[in-house]
Structures are given as C-alpha cells and as structure tokens.
C-alpha cells in the first residue's frame, strides 16, 4: 500500500517496524531513542496498516484508547466501508501518544500461520482508500492529552450524578 501510494505521487511519512507481535519492540526502540517524537511531530494523524480482516478501523487496542473520533471520521470518509472496533496490542498503542492514530485492516486473515491468506481484490480497494485519505481527507487534529487521557466507565458516570 505504501509503495503504491508513493508511486502515485502521494507525500507520506511512514515507519516500518519489527516485532509488533512480540511486544512492539521495533516501535519502542524508536520511542526510546527519541526518534519517534521527532519523526511524527509534523504528522496530522497516523494510520497503522497492520490489522487482519477487511473492514476494521481500530479506535483502541490492548487496553489503550487510540482516537475514536479519527476512526469514525475515516469510516465516514470511506463510505462506511469500515467499522470502528477494538483490537489487541499493536504499534498504535505507542503511536497514539504522539498523534491521533488508528489501526486499519489490510485484507489478510489467519496471520502468522501456514494458512495466512491475502484478499488481493480487497487490498486494492483499501489501497485506493488510503490514497484518498492521504490526498483528500481533512482532519483537524486534537492534542493527544485531550483525546486519549480521559475515559469514563459506567460506574464513574453513576457516581458523578449520585446514583
């Protein structure tokens, strides 16, 4: 997807990391040596292209909230071709501390098995969505301390209103 976007003249910053499945070691190395903050400082938002399936737009994962507003805005932009949901640990858990981030399905199933399969027809559609997002999507970013740090459980709500 990234190479095709570059071939089509899109201007994008990208990170290729390793070891996401073993604790996000690659992205954490970038974070530890302060490279990550510098690299994504000018980025309006981040889309992690590493989610199994065909139609997930993750707004949270591994107990970390990424950005539900960005996830829903991207779903709307793609014509509801995706659905907002949650997942497990990913590099997005780290990236969301630096800019609004989501994790997007990229048309594969049965990851890391002998039965891993890619739906190339759907992958092309997703590539077209990503290029559309890069070239046409307008999003006004919110500082990360505003969107990701406050969560409310139903219990908090009841206590606040005296129930």
Kindly give the residue locations of the regions a language model identified.
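His/Asp/Glu-rich mid-to-C-terminal helical/loop segments that flank catalytic regions of hydrolases
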Residues: 6-7, 110-163
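Generic secondary-structure signature for well-ordered alpha-helical cores
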Residues: 7, 11, 32, 76-79, ...
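Acidic/histidine-rich catalytic neighborhood of metal-dependent amide-processing enzymes
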Residues: 1-69, 84
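Amphipathic, non-transmembrane alpha-helical secondary structure
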Residues: 3, 28-31, 93, 124, ...
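Structural element of the ATP-grasp superfamily
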Residues: 2, 74-75, 94-95
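Zn-dependent metallopeptidase/amidohydrolase metal-coordination segment
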Residues: 81-126
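Hydrophobic alpha-helical segments
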Residues: 32, 64, 104, 119-121, ...
């Amino acid at each position: 997807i990234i190479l095709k976007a570059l071939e089509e003249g899109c201007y994008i910053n990208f990170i290729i990391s390793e070891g996401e499945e073993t604790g996000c070691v690659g992205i954490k190395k970038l974070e530890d040596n302060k490279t990550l903050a510098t690299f994504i400082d000018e980025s309006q938002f981040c889309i992690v292209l590493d989610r199994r399936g065909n139609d997930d737009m993750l707004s949270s994962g591994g107990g970390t909230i990424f950005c539900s507003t960005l996830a829903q805005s991207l779903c709307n932009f793609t014509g509801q071709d995706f659905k907002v949901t949650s997942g497990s640990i990913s590099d997005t858990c780290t990236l969301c501390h630096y800019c609004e981030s989501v994790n997007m399905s990229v048309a594969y199933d049965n990851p890391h098995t002998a039965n891993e399969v890619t739906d190339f027809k759907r992958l092309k559609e997703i590539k077209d969505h990503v290029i559309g997002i890069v070239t046409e999507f307008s999003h006004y970013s919110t500082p990360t301390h505003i969107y990701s740090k406050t969560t409310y459980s139903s219990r908090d709500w009841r206590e606040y209103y005296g129930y």
